Each structure stands twice: as structure tokens, then as C-alpha cells.
């Protein structure tokens, strides 16, 4: 019973942060699973694929809850969200099957490199105007952005989401902020919708392959549903600049840890 309660609390925390920044929360869950819950450190998971599949299920729960919250707030730019979401589907499906080919050390190294890169980009850009653009100064009806580039990036977001179990928002939000010029609150809400759609395909493929451990997945997912509602409310009232800076540092440090773990596992040190 205590273990189930711990899963629920973990889900609430992950869901709150994930919806607040439009990142899904998988980037928090995967390191926790890998460091404490997979053999030889724990007994919940036995393979990396189970870590990814279970994490992605929690991301799905977080994203669907956050999507409904942001729809009520009218923060989702649907003319971007729908094509971006559709573009993630083939990438997510492909990633779900290619995840079978990732070994433990190789997975850790690739995941770490991705985390370090994203952490650096988020920190270097967080002090600029793009990260602090006001919704009031941006008209969604007339705003122009590079749709083909957004669609192309979204395909790779879906692929990364399913491969790494991180939801893809950790790539999508910076892209919408710093490449397409969306205000932070619009980028977060739109990313949450895209995560929901891409996670459907990713979760489906992982479920068919038996990669989801349903006990922890359901409890963490339930917590993520609750946390996403809290995160969406906080996002509506707050400026995410400080959170983005702190989060970028955390992502960078976790990435370094996974790079070291992967390199040691591959016999480089």
C-alpha cells in the first residue's frame, strides 16, 4: 500500500511540473526509473523498454489531463497543434519499435547527450525576449510562423518521445519558443496537446509489445492527471522564466550523469 501511495505522489509531482512547462514529465520519470527501480538497483523493471513504456503511459495521462485544462483556458493554438500532432504519429510509431534495439549503456549515453543538449539550449535562451513574450502582445489569429519546419520537427519529436519515453515536449517547447516565436504560455499549452496525440501512438505500440508495467503505470498516471490540473493553473498565473532556468540546470546535470553511466557501461572508462 505504501509503495502505491509513493507512486501516486510521484505522479502528482511529475504531472505538475510536466503540465507547467509542457514537457510531459518523462524526463523526470526516466532518470528515477533508471537510477532506483531497474535491476540491479531495484526490481520494478527488468528492461529499458519497460522503463520507456511505463514512463510514456504516465506522459499520456499527464498530457490528456493538461490538454483539457488548457482547452478551458483557450491557450492551445489549434491551427498549429493539429498538424504538429499529426506529424508526430508516424515518428512515435517508428520509435516504439526501434526501442527494442537499444541496449542499456547505449540508451543511457544517447539519452544523456539529448538531455545535455536540451539543458544547454534552454539555459542559454531563457534570459532572452522569446522566453518572456507576453500572450497579450501576440495575436493568434494573425501570427505567422514556419509551418513546414514545425511539422518536420514534430515528426522527430514523436520519434524521440517513443524512443526515450520523455514525451517530446522537452524538444517541442524550446522549438516553439525560440524557432517559431510562440509566447511561453501558448507554447506550453500547444505542446501539451501535441504530447497527448503522439503519446497515444507511442503507448499503443509499447503496450502491444508488453513494455508497460501496469501497477506503477496506473498509479503514477492517476497522480499525473491530478498534477496536470495543478500545473496548468500555476502556468496561467506565473512567469516560467525562473522555472525554465532551474529546470535547464537540472536537465543538464542529469544528462551528464547518464552520459557517464553509459560510457562506463560501454567500457570507455
Predicted regions: what is each one?
Residues 45-52, 188, 192:
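Small-residue hotspots at the loop-to-helix junctions and early N-terminal turns
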Residues 55-59, 191-195, 216-221:
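Short hydrophobic/aromatic, small-residue-rich stretches within specific transmembrane helices
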Residues 195-201:
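Transmembrane helix-bundle signature of multi-pass secondary active exporters and lipid flippases
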Residues 22-32, 165-175:
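Transmembrane helix boundary and interhelical junction motifs in multipass membrane proteins
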Residues 1-20, 28, 34-49, 65-160, ...:
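Juxtamembrane transmembrane-helix boundary motif
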Residues 143, 166-167, 191:
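A short glycine-/small-residue-rich loop at the edge of a beta-strand within enzyme catalytic domains
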Residues 175-188, 193:
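Transmembrane helical segments that form the transport core of multi-pass membrane transport proteins
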Amino acid at each position: 500500500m505504501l509503495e502505491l501511495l509513493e507512486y501516486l505522489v510521484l505522479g502528482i509531482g511529475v504531472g505538475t511540473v510536466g503540465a507547467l512547462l509542457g514537457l510531459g514529465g518523462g524526463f523526470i520519470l526516466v532518470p528515477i526509473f533508471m537510477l532506483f527501480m531497474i535491476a540491479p538497483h531495484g526490481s520494478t523493471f527488468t528492461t529499458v523498454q519497460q522503463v520507456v513504456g511505463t514512463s510514456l503511459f504516465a506522459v499520456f495521462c499527464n498530457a490528456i489531463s493538461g490538454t483539457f485544462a488548457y482547452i478551458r483556458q483557450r491557450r492551445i493554438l489549434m491551427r498549429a497543434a493539429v498538424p504538429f500532432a499529426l506529424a508526430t504519429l508516424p515518428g512515435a510509431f517508428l520509435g516504439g519499435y526501434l526501442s527494442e534495439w537499444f541496449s542499456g549503456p547505449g540508451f543511457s549515453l544517447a539519452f544523456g547527450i539529448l538531455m545535455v543538449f536540451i539543458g544547454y539550449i534552454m539555459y542559454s535562451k531563457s534570459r532572452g525576449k522569446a522566453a518572456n513574450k507576453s500572450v497579450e502582445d501576440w495575436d493568434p489569429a494573425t501570427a505567422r510562423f514556419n509551418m513546414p519546419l514545425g511539422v518536420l520537427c514534430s515528426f522527430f519529436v514523436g520519434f524521440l518521445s517513443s524512443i526515450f519515453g520523455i514525451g517530446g515536449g522537452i524538444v517541442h517547447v524550446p522549438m516553439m519558443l525560440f524557432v517559431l516565436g510562440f509566447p511561453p504560455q501558448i507554447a506550453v499549452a500547444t505542446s501539451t496537446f501535441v504530447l497527448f496525440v503522439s503519446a497515444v501512438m507511442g503507448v499503443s505500440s509499447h503496450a502491444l509489445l508488453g513494455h508497460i508495467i501496469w501497477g506503477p503505470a496506473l498509479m503514477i498516471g492517476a497522480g499525473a492527471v491530478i498534477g496536470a490540473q495543478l500545473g496548468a493553473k500555476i502556468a496561467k498565473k506565473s512567469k516560467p522564466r525562473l522555472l525554465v532556468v532551474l529546470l535547464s540546470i537540472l536537465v543538464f546535470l542529469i544528462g551528464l550523469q547518464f552520459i557517464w553511466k553509459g560510457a562506463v557501461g560501454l567500457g570507455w572508462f
